[in-house]
Amino acid sequence: MYLLPLLFPLLNLFISCILGKFLGKRVLFVLVINMLFSAIFSFWIFYEVGINKSVCYIDLGPWFHIGLLKLNWLFLFDSITSVMLVLVVFVSLLVHLYSIDYMSGDPHIIRFLGYLSLFTFFMLMLVTSGNFVQLFLGWEGVGLSSYLLINFWYTRIQANKSAMKAIIVNRFGDFGIYFSLLVIFFFFKSFDFGVVFNLVQFLDTQPRMSFLGFSLNRVDLIVIFLFLGAIGKSAQLGLHTWLPDAMEGPTPVSALIHAATMVTAGVFVLIRSSPILEYSSTGLFLVSLIGGLTALFAGTVGLVQYDIKKVIAYSTCSQLGYMFFACGMSNYSVGLFHLFNHGFFKALLFLGAGSVIHALLDEQDMRKMGGLIKLMPLTYVAILVGSLSLTGFPFLTGFYSKEVVLEIAFSKFSINSFFIYWLGVFAAFITSFYSIRLMYLVFFARPNSHARAVNSSHESSSFIFYVLAFLGFLSIFIGFIFKDLFIGLGTDFWANSIFNLYVNSDILYAEFLDYYYKLIPLVFSIVGLFFSLFVYFVIYDYTVFVVKNKFFRYAYFFLAKKWYFDLLYNNIFVFNLLSSFYLLTFKIIDRGLIELFGPLSFVRLINKSSIIFSSFQTGFLYNYIFVVLLGLMFFIKLTSSLFFPSFNSFFNFGLFICLLSLIIFLSFGNKKQNI
C-alpha cells in the first residue's frame, strides 16, 4: 500500500512508451486515472503516518554489498514524507489534467505526459528514500527528467541551450552531494539515515580546518557539502542562473518544477538532514545568509523582467530563499510549511500564466499583452489570488507561513538574524511591487497585442478552468487549515522526523513577539502593493523618469543584466575554461603530444631509418664482404662468450677492427659514389 504512490507514476511511463503508439490519445485518460489513484493513496499515507503517527519503514532487501558498504532498498514514511507525498502527487495530478488541454495540439503529448510521470516518480523516490544513496538516485533522476522536459521541444535551439545549462549548472551543485556522501561514509561507514542521524552527535567537534575565516569541524564539512548540493538544485544565489532559462519548456513543466519537484528537492534535503545541521552553527549561518540574499536578489531582478514566466520564476527563487533562511534559523517545520503552501499558489500562478499564453497564441512578453481583464476574467481572478498569496496578503495561504518565517528571524535576537530579517522584509516589499506590476501589464494596460491574438483571446476550456479554480481555493484556505497542525504551538505532528536542539528552538519567542514587530513585514508588503499601484496606475510617464535620471538608469541596467552573473560566468569562467581546455586538449595533446609520439613521429622514424639503411647499399663488393664478416664476428663473439670464455678479449679486438674498417670503407664508398 505504501509503495503504490510510487508505482503508479512508474506504470504511467511504461504505458506511455509501450501502449501510447497503439491507443493514441485515449491513453491520456489512463495516465490521469493512475495519477488519481496515486493521489488517493498519498492522502491515505498522510492520514496514517502524519495524523495517526504510524511511521513506516519498508526494507525490500539488499541492493548491493561491497566491502563495508551494505545497502538495502529502504523506504521511510514519516511526517516529512507524508507532507511531500501529498504536495508532489496532488500538484502532478493537476498538471497532468491541465496538460491534456494545454498540449492538445502537440503530436507528442503522450511522450510529454510520460516524462511528467517519470519526473514525479523520481521526486517520490527522493522523498521516500531511507538512505543517502537512494536519495541520491532520486536526486539525479529529477535532474535527468528536468533536462528531458525543458528540452521537450528539441527542435528549438534555445530549448537545447536551456536544458544543457540546467543540467551543467546542477552538476556543480551535485559535486557537493557527491563529496557529502564520501565524507558521510568515511565517518560513519553507513548511509542509512537512522545510523547517521544517531551517531552524528558523537563526532569530534574540534576545528580541523579553516576556510574563508571559518573554523570547520567534521559536521561543518558534511553540512557545507550538503548545502552546496541544495544551492544548485534549489537555484540559490550563485547557482541560480539555470532557473529562468528553464522557462523554455512547456508551461506545465514550469509549474511542476517550481511548485512541487526539482527546486524543492534542495529544501527537502536540508529538512531531512536536520539532525546533522543542528550540530553545525557555521552551516546554519551560511544557509540563512544565502537564503536571505537570494530572496532579495531574485526579487530585485524580477522587478525588470518582461517575460511573464520569468517574473514568476524569479519569485520562486525568492520564496526558496525564505525557506532556506527558515532552515538556517533551525525552524524546519516553518520552512516545510512554507514549501507546502508555496507549491499550491505557485502552481496556480504558472498555470494561470499558461492560460494567458495559450489565449494569446504563445505570446509571453507582457509588453505585448494588456486589456485582458474583460476577455479573461476567470484567469484574472486566479492570477490575482495567486499573486496576493505570494505577497503574503492577510488571510491567504502565503500569509500564514511567510510572516512566521520573518517573525522567527526577528526572534533570534542576534546581529546575523536581524540582518537576514531585514533582507526578508525588503524582499517582501519588492515581491508586492512586481506582483502588481505583472497584474497591470497583463490585465489593465492598454492592449498591445496583435489584433488577431486579441480577437482570438478567450477563457480556456473546462480542464484548465477547473484546475485553476481548485488551486485558487487551496491558495486561499490551505494555509489556514494546516497552520495549527504544522506549526501551531505545542503540535506534535512532526514527532521525531524533525530534530531541533533546545538551544536553537525559538518558535516560542516568535509566538509572543510584540504585535508591532509582527506587523513590520505586513506593512512593507502593503506599502509595496500600494506603491506599485501608484506607479502603474497614476504615474504614466515613469519610464521617462527612469531614463532621464542617471542613477535609476544605471540601476535599471544593473537589474536587467541580472546583477551581471551570466556575464561574469561567461567571460571569466566559461570563456577562460574553454580557452584553457582548447589549448590543453587540441593544441598540446591532439596537435602536440599525439603527433609527436603518434603518426608523425612514426613517419619520421621510418624516413630516417630508410636513409640509414640505404647507405649500406653502395654497389661495391668489398662493402658487402665487410658486412658479412661483421655478422660472422658477431656470431662468433656470441658463441665464444658461451662456450670459449677465454677467447673473449681476442674476439672483442677483432670485432672492433671490423667495425672500424666498415665505417671507413662505407665513408670511402659513399664519397666515391658522389664523385
UniProtKB/Swiss-Prot annotation:
S-S bonds: none
Spans traversing the lipid bilayer: 3-23, 27-47, 75-95, 108-127, 132-154, 177-197, 211-231, 251-271, 284-304, 311-329, 334-354, 380-400, 413-433, 462-482, 519-539, 564-584, 593-613, 624-644, 649-669
EC nos: 7.1.1.2
Keyword set, alphabetical order: Electron transport, Membrane, Mitochondrion, Mitochondrion inner membrane, NAD, Respiratory chain, Translocase, Transmembrane, Transmembrane helix, Transport, Ubiquinone
Gene Ontology cellular-component terms listed: mitochondrial inner membrane
Keyword Secreted: no
Cleavable signal peptide: none
GO biological process, any: electron transport coupled proton transport
Location in or out of the cell: Mitochondrion inner membrane
Membership in a protein family: Belongs to the complex I subunit 5 family.
Protein name as catalogued: NADH-ubiquinone oxidoreductase chain 5
Gene this chain is encoded by: ND5
